[in-house]
Structure formats: structure tokens, C-alpha cells
Amino acid sequence: MYREYKPNILLAPYIETYWATDESLSGRQTLRILPDGDINVLFNLAENEVDIIKPFIPYIIGTKTTFSNVVHERADRMIGVRFRPCAISAYTKVPVYEFNNCRVDTSLFLSLFADFNSERLAEKEDEIERLNYIEEYLLGKLNCLNNIDKQFIYVAEYIRMTNGMVPVNKLLDKVCLSQRQFERQF
């Protein structure tokens, strides 16, 4: 079953939602994941070392540009943090496009979860305790965020609000940029 939880109001400019799933499967299933423009940080809560995503280690799941089929052969238990468009840039200096169509172990580079204590997450008894632990960690990082150009965030949100169906000239008028300025930044 899939559930969503709202973030703390201080994290709301960066995090769209937390989500959790615990699927009980009665055999092999293939799920089609459609591109949604989001970047997620994913925690696998199933303690199975065979999994591609190691248990309790945070992974960045980059923006998908095409659908992907994910094969599940047993029960899945995961927690995710879905970031708002461009907001993960506040937590890492790696350009967002570097994560496109990728699954990256956050311990491999300097990022928001570089010093995250996965063992403490594993010790938590239930989903709510784990979500609270992740949120407390993210709240603790608020004082060391990278600056993000507010105009950049507004452009990304506006494109998302219009489902990408906005002519470039209208977008430029809306965000008060010339085409040349827009091309330099985007």
C-alpha cells in the first residue's frame, strides 16, 4: 500500500512529500514507472542484500525522461522523499541533470545524505519513527543549504503547473527574462 505524508513547514519549499510503500506480492510483478519530473531519495527497508538498492542506504532516483519497468519478486518496503523541482540543488552541488535516469548511492559523493546514519534508521521500530528520523536529519541541514536562484525555481514550478504546455515566449514574459538570459541559465 502506498501512503504520502506532508513535510514539516520549514521543509515545504524543498520537499513535496514523503511517501512509503509496503507491497505484499504473490509472485513476480512488473510495475511501469512513468516520468513525472521529480527527483526522489529512496530508502529500501527490506533487509535483503540481493537487492540492487542496499537496505537503509539513501539513493537519489533522478528525473526520468522515459518510462521504466521495475520487476518485483517479493514484498517491497520503501520510504521516499520527493523533492520539488530543482530543490535538491539546495542539498548538493552536483547539477540536477547528472541524476537524470539514474539511481545513485548518496554515500558515493558529497551530498545531502553524505553523513546520514543508516544504522540508526534501521533501528527505528516503525514507519513513522523512520520518517521522523529522516525529517529531523533534513531539518538539521537547513542551516547549510546551497543558494538556489529563486527565478530558476519559479520557472520549474511554472512549467510543472502548465504540464509543460507553455510556449517559451509566454514563459519568458511570465518570469521576466530575455531569451538570451534564459538560454544562459537553462
Residue ranges and their predicted role:
Residues M1-N163, P167-N169, K174-Q179:
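Alpha-helical bundle regulatory/interaction domains
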Residues F186:
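DNA major-groove recognition helix of helix-turn-helix
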